[in-house]
Amino acid sequence: MSALAISCPSTSKARGRPLGATALAIRSAVHDLTDTYERMTVRQVFYALEVAEIVEKTEAGYRQVQAQVLRMRREGLLSWEFITDGTRWQRKPESFDTVEDAMTMMARTYRRDLWQAQDMRIEVWLEKDALADIVTGVTDEWDVSLMVSRGQSSATFLWRAAMAAQAAWTQMGVATFIYALYDRDAGGRRAARTIERELPEHAPGVPVTFTLLGVTDEQVEDWQLPSRPGKQSDPEAGKFDGRAVELDAIPPDKLIGLVEDAIMQHVDPRSWAIEQSIEHEEREVLYELVRQAA
């Protein structure tokens, strides 16, 4: 369903000012994107429009897209929810009006650990928090940890991840599989290598399998992903071979598909269905407690 609040207008004015040809083309293209995708980041919209040759592959082109998207939202032409932003967030403890409300929420959100019958655990590592809202729908559905590193992972973040893998192995004999989504540039490759190297160093003897899920060389060629100039400020920029491609250049549906396919290859359908059935029964027990309390 389209994320537009109302249909795209034919007027060539915005707030009384005439819109140029590029601005109109951007608005029309964004309108079309809402028919295909539920949510996107501004940078994903930019790459889609750059591939369509509506804007140039420059920071000026990005700012044009950013400006029109913001104006469309303020003018009521684009749902505020269409553009996702995982870079800002708030913390607040969850609270309830009544005990009954708390019990109802507990029953509604109850999740059984469906992976306990799969003898493994999965983590999806993501370089950019701006893309977290795109990926989290899949990771939440499959009850998989989404590890957002925001570029280079901190030593603490890596150590905690290694300790979680170690605990799973020593306590339950569960191996860890890591799927990493990082830019194809010097910084992204370095961040991915660090994960692959340091987790086993912190947890020697623990089976940790690392896979670079994206952006891969094959994806760049097969999907004709747009590139960008490499970050020359990176100390390893001169050593990086090939075109720099941001994770945002992967269309949302393909990004979601990558994650889901990676997860599903580890799922045994029969045991998963059994665990889901048990989960349903346990949730009904909780709902019965709510009814009795009422």
Regions from the language model: what does each represent?
Residues 1-176, 189-294:
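Nucleic-acid enzyme cleavage-core boundary/entry regions
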